[in-house]
Amino acid sequence: MNLTSPKVSTMFFDQIITVTDHNVTWEKIQNCLYNLYGEATYNSWLSSLKFVSSRNGEVLLSVSTRFIKEWITVHYMKKILSLWQSEDKSIRSIDIQVIEERNSNFNVILKNREESNHNLGSPLDPRFTFDNFVVGKPNELAFTAAKRVAESIDPILGSNPLFLYGGVGLGKTHLMHAIAWHIVNSPSAKRKVVYLSAEKFMYQYITALRSKDIMLFKEQFRSVDVLMVDDVQFISGKDSTQEEFFHTFNALIDQNKQLVISADRSPSDLDGVEERIKSRLGWGLVADINETTFELRLGILQAKVEQMNMYVPKDVLEFLARNIKSNIRELEGALNKVTHTSLIGRSMTVESASETLIDLLRSNHRSVTIEEIQKKVAEFFNIKVADMQSNRRLRSLARPRQIAMYFAKKFTQKSLPDIGRNFGGRDHATVIHAVKQVENFIKTDSKFADEINRLKKMFK
């Protein structure tokens, strides 16, 4: 009997060699991606990619979630394909499939994503709606912009992000909550809204890093339809939080999602915040909320009294509106104190209100001297106090001098001639001209108006 060697197919061995070759290629590409994008980006997005197979010029990779797949496809796929083709010219395309890691902690959490997203943000205050926001000239632009964003299903061109800024207690948070309430209760479209403070964003980011749930953090924040971050100035000087905020911002803008941000100052004045973030915060509509006027303060008090279903004499409301100028919170707090006097049997009069609020009124009427104004304005513009009295007409000196005159007229009881005498013996006509110049610039130059608002806070 002739014994012949059996035929052994080489196909199986060819497949082993092919898979091994492609694994080596994939390792090279991973090293290239690491060197190209750096450790942070690689670990955040690309390290989760796994090689599955290669057949007929098509490479198949896998990741654990659809979100990661979409992100890599949009931001890194061209580069991955280019790197692979430089190693193997037969490769025509790369596809990514989602293979859930069912036993991983990450996916257990994702099954409860709705609950997780619900806990992602901060609770909304039911008092803060558009209906009970009192509108006046100082907040008209911010209110209109906020309502347009809330009512629009898709981001409005030129209003993404919407950036609201103004001093403490002027209504920024009220508008933020109002936007969120309107969207949540809108029957036309169910959008996922997350509202939170910048401080909470930072602490959630730190928690995610410590618990190694950073991918969950990214997916949660980058899968919302509307992200609202209050008091963004809090991330000033916090480099790693700024880095994550920057990438979250970009991811949402790329997906055409709406952002609403608030701060106590304009984007350009956010000291300690990276320039690239400040630039992006100013991409859309920047709306400031100015200090309240007498009319607006009176309107707020009247609305509050109506809401409380109480009677407060008109002269008492006018007294409060005229004397409590700092912010809306203090104004409403003053009203609450005054109304409580009726609970102990005292009538609400201007006299009783004055007695009840004596400490608050004293702080709101702190006297400011012309010398103090000159010193603070000079420090702000980095000039000498002596330049305030000099006759030099350089623009770098004349403008600060005019601003100091404007504040002297606004914050002191001095007559125009008295003010002029404190500025190198100038006459009252020069003071009037200076005040008008400053008022005109405030109306026409937003950057100038910001400087005035920042200076104004120094005298309070």
From Swiss-Prot:
- Specify the domain of life of the species encoding this protein: Bacteria
Mind telling me which SMART domains this protein's record contains?
Answer: AAA (SM00382), Bac_DnaA_C (SM00760)
PROSITE patterns linked: DNAA
Q: Which UniProt keywords apply?
A: ATP-binding, Cytoplasm, DNA replication, DNA-binding, Lipid-binding, Nucleotide-binding
Location of the region described as Domain I, interacts with DnaA modulators in the Swiss-Prot/TrEMBL record: 1-91
Keyword Disulfide bond recorded: no
Subunit note: Oligomerizes as a right-handed, spiral filament on DNA at oriC.
- Spell out the NCBIfam families in the cross-references: DnaA
What is the protein's name according to its record? Chromosomal replication initiator protein DnaA
Organism encoding this protein:
Wolbachia pipientis wMel
